[in-house]
Amino acid sequence: MAVKVLVVDDSGFFRRRVSEILSADGQIQVVGTGTNGREAIEQALALRPDVITMDYEMPLMDGITAVRNIMQRCPTPVLMFSSLTHEGARVTLDALDAGAVDYLPKNFEDISRNPDKVRQLLCEKVLTIARSNRRSISLPPLPSATSSSHAPASSSSVGASARVGAGASPAPASTSAAPKRKAYRLVAIGTSTGGPVALQRVLTQLPANFPAPLVLIQHMPAAFTKAFAERLDKLCRINVKEAEDGDILRPGLALLAPGGKQMMVDGRGTVRILPGDERLNYKPCVDVTFGSAAKAYNDKVLAVVLTGMGADGREGARLLKQGGSQVWAQDEASCVIYGMPMAVVKANLADAVYGLDDIGRHLVEACQ
């Protein structure tokens, strides 16, 4: 059965273009279009699509307000289109907090050297998020990142796509044994689709005196990572910044890999930022950072693979395991997309599998 898609944008040209691209894929059926947020809600209720694509800047009602309403009334995976600017990044992160599952730059065809490949990416994203965990996106929206810097985090200060919606049963408790305590020299966390909210959920549980350095690898465009790091820094008690070449790892500091580049660490505790290798699908790539950590710290790394499509992180996890380090994976019930964690689990590389709400607490227990 074809995936039913609702396309919402105030630009007639863009609605037609997105509809043409999606309709060219035999697995996708465009069942309706809308020109603003109000129409998005009306059409979502009437047509019950499997996926909605939506712009964030529209008349009458903006995309973020529409997403919040849709998540409350008929939870549906939403793919947001955004601009590759700092402001576009901020708005996109707000949309993810409101319940959107993924995003693409609005000029996705123009910025690619291979338009055919990026058109295929749009279809792949739609097909993938159509299979996303609806229970994990069905939450009322949460406030945007306006809290004071490093204030204690409350359970309500995190985004929507990681939580269980009204009327749904809670995710099952983690079945893995208590985490092994060890003097870890590094905590490395890798993620993709659903990651911005998942990282927010985990990191806001860490105390300001968290005893280990952290590196974060989130598949994200170059224009977005600085805004995302700033957002996390406002919400978390630990410090968070976008990594720069030469940064020094230190306890209580999380360094986010910059988009479009690769991040590596060395045994002296120094971060190296390298140009993105065109041969790699992801920039930043979880495998690259995990692999460098395995070489630098042997058995002193605690790695966590969170929600995301694909299998990035699996080979890096294999190297970490060969050196004696610990690898955790997020459980299927709490993932938006159970791809990257599943790859680690199926390869028998996960020492523990935890629900998203348990990971932060277990990190504290393991590293104290």
Curated annotation (Swiss-Prot):
Read off the InterPro entries from this record.
Answer: CheB-like (IPR008248), CheB_C (IPR035909), CheY-like_superfamily (IPR011006), Sig_transdc_resp-reg_Me-estase (IPR000673), Sig_transdc_resp-reg_receiver (IPR001789)
Tell me the superkingdom of the source: Bacteria
Q: Which SUPFAM superfamilies match?
A: CheY-like, Methylesterase CheB, C-terminal domain
Description of the deletion phenotype: Deletion mutant is nonchemotactic. Mutant is not attenuated for virulence in C.elegans whereas in vitro motility and chemotaxis are severely impaired.
Q: Which reaction does it catalyse?
A: [protein]-L-glutamate 5-O-methyl ester + H2O = L-glutamyl-[protein] + methanol + H(+); L-glutaminyl-[protein] + H2O = L-glutamyl-[protein] + NH4(+)
Q: How is it modified after translation?
A: Phosphorylated by CheA. Phosphorylation of the N-terminal regulatory domain activates the methylesterase activity.
Q: Which residues form the CheB-type methylesterase domain?
A: 172-368
Function of this protein? Involved in chemotaxis. Part of a chemotaxis signal transduction system that modulates chemotaxis in response to various stimuli. Catalyzes the demethylation of specific methylglutamate residues introduced into the chemoreceptors (methyl-accepting chemotaxis proteins or MCP) by CheR. Also mediates the irreversible deamidation of specific glutamine residues to glutamic acid.
Q: What is known of its domains?
A: Contains a C-terminal catalytic domain, and an N-terminal region which modulates catalytic activity.
* Identification of the protein by name: Protein-glutamate methylesterase/protein-glutamine glutaminase 1
Task: Give the originating organism.
Answer: Pseudomonas aeruginosa (strain ATCC 15692 / DSM 22644 / CIP 104116 / JCM 14847 / LMG 12228 / 1C / PRS 101 / PAO1)
